[in-house]
Amino acid sequence: MMKRILLLLLTAATIFCSCSKQSSKKLNGEYHYRIGGAVTTQTTDGKNTEYEILIEYQFGTMKIISTDSKNKTLYISMSSAMKGTFSNFTATEKDGVITFKDAEIQVSTRLPGETSSGTMSKNTTKICVDGVGKRYGDELLFDLTAKGIITTKYPDPEKGIDVITDLKVISSSIKCEASKND
C-alpha cells in the first residue's frame, strides 16, 4: 500500500514538473507583432512643459527563445523592417505571465500635430519600459509602462534646426499584441 502511494506521488510530481517546464517552451517561436501608444513627458529644463509623444503603430517580427527552462528565462527579439527598429531583452515567465523590467525598445515616434511625413514620424526613439504580458492561445498581449528619461529630437521651425532634448516620462499607455506564426 505504501509503495502505491509513493508511486502515485512520484507520478504526480513528474507530471507537474513537466508541465511547468513546458509552459515557457510553448512560448518559443516566431510571432508577428503590433505596438503603439502614447507617452506623456515633461521637459527637464526647469520649465516643466508637457509633451505627449505618440508611438506610431509599427508592425514587425518577434522571436521568443526559452534560454533557461528551470528559471523560465526568455530571450525576446523584436524587429520592424519598415521602421528600421530592433530591440532585444530578457523576460521571465511564471504561471503564464511574462514580465520584464528595464527593457530598452526602439520605436518610431512623433509629436501630435505633425504630419506622418514630418521629421518626427521618422524619428527612432529609445524608450525604457517595464512590461507584463499574458498568453491567450497563440496570442500574446503586453501592457508596457515607459519610465525614466527619453532623449528625442524635434524640428524647431524658428531656428531651422533639429533640437535634441531630454524628456522625463510622467505616464504612458503602450500596448503590444503578438500572434504566433504558423
State where each predicted segment sits.
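Sec-dependent signal peptide recognition
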Residues: 3-9
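C-terminal motif of bacterial Sec signal peptides marking the signal peptidase cleavage site
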Residues: 15-18
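Bacterial signal peptide processing site
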Residues: 20-22
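Tryptophan-anchored aromatic micro-motifs
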Residues: 24-52
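Extended low-polarity, hydrophobic cluster-rich segments
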Residues: 31-38, 56-62, 78, 127-133, ...
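Generic short beta-strand segments
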Residues: 32-43, 101-114, 143-155
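Predominantly extracellular/secreted and cell-surface proteins with exposed
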Residues: 55-136
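Edge beta-strand at a domain terminus
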Residues: 137-182
